[in-house]
């Protein structure tokens, strides 16, 4: 009776199915197992559980339903289904033909549709190629078959062949195996190796010791020794490099396996200078020598005057000092522009202000050169401003006599009085500003008969200005008795007409016993009414009844309190030669420049204590300026009168010498 069917079919089984079960179990006579192995739960998952229910041992035990149900459950488990292909392959090797049920058993086999079909259907199919993930299950599960005594041992060689078949299949096609043909992701992510840089040739730098010799030829196998590098160089060029005309030209350098190859003979001979300590090109200005002429030409530029390396530190300091002096002179000139005294006025007053910002250097030089023409323009401007322009245009036609007389009469009425008042003061100030801004050139004019009237007018105006100036000065002294008179501080005139005051000449005698009164007056005038004083020597002098000697007669060994100890020359020379102390020297030069700026700022020709004096609306400084302006016009007019008188006297002499008088037509 067959119990390898569904449990419901087992209940309806009869004795007719017994023959079928016995026939099925005849093919498994080679495997013998104990009954306890069929009931074991661990063996239920093994492939041997498929055939254990059909073994003779189970049939001898009366076909227990427990064992039949256990084998049936093991046959339907998922693990058994996954291993079913391998088991069927093993059974096909032992069976000569496929199992075919008899005709009498067809109703029973049709009723059992699940288990027999799942067991017999893989027998008609060949092993198919599985995915590699499933193939790992078979490769990693050989332990189930090794524990079987005969059944597993017979299956083991076939199992290895079966495992080798997918591996050979993958190796042949190369789809899934990670072989050398397909790079991995790590290999793709790796950076390509850096290119190897070619070997750079380095050459030995020639030193002075290398130029002493002897010199050995290192060309290939040549070992000739020479005394001078010139002979070695000629040997290389003639014997080793050769010439094309001699059919021995070699353009490859073989000096210590150098291997440099050139195209022309000139190139290889120029390359040989790298190996030979030869410097035939010498500098005429220094002791340096060079291998190539272009190197010498490049070096010669460093000896140019405008090259930065040529300028030593002392020269750079000298240039800075010159620039600083020019800057300080400009500052001093600007300050002197506000220090114009009355003694500077006369005819040279309007020659231009040296420090005035309105004038450039060229125009200022031109005014100094053309001083006479500029003075002529000043005089003409003053005369025109005081309505004396008609006297420079004498009548040339007879019909114009009445017009000239009437215009002269009108001019006389238009002229202001010769008294110096506030109107004349404002007019001269306006004229002063106009002359400082505009300087057109005018031709000298010949004055007519009115030149005497002009001279008389400006003479009276000059006298009026002098009186006003003296009255204002005395009034200022009365208001400020402790202040010296403005006339003494600023001398009115100087007969020599110099732009700068002359220095005093100090004699060997004492100050009290002067040789002449004129010498003493000159000292007083040049030093604002007091005798000059000098810094005292910082040491005690022996007292004697005789008057002390002037400072010029003293020895020059003392140190004044106004002097400053100088630095030693050696320290300055050493610091100038040292180029590493440039920054410190720059700081020192900057501080010294600032000190010089402060000292120059303190210099001023004008006494700061002298304030602007204004009395009754008149500025005392402007009054002195106007006095010099009128005086310059008066001097010029007197020169013109003198010149005209000379011309008239010459004409009278010529008229006396003539035999016949001339007749003038009206």
UniProtKB/Swiss-Prot annotation:
GO terms for molecular function: DNA binding; zinc ion binding. One of its GO terms (cellular component) is nucleus. InterPro entries: pacC/RIM101, Znf_C2H2_sf, Znf_C2H2_type. A motif (YPX[LI] motif 2) lies at residues 534-537. Residues 1-77, 96-122, 294-347, 474-527, 560-593 are annotated as: Disordered. Residues 571-593 have a biased composition (Acidic residues). A motif (YPX[LI] motif 1) lies at residues 500-503. A motif (YPX[LI] motif 3) lies at residues 660-663. SUPFAM superfamilies: beta-beta-alpha zinc fingers (SSF57667). A zinc finger (C2H2-type) spans 215-240, 251-275, 281-303. The keyword Nucleus applies. Keywords: Activator, Coiled coil, Cytoplasm, DNA-binding, Metal-binding, Nucleus, Repeat, Repressor, Transcription, Transcription regulation, Zinc, Zinc-finger. Activated by C-terminal proteolytic cleavage by signaling protease at neutral to alkaline ambient pH. Transcription factor that mediates regulation of both acid- and alkaline-expressed genes in response to ambient pH. At alkaline ambient pH, activates transcription of alkaline-expressed genes (including RIM101 itself) and represses transcription of acid-expressed genes. This is pH-response transcription factor pacC/RIM101. The gene is RIM101.
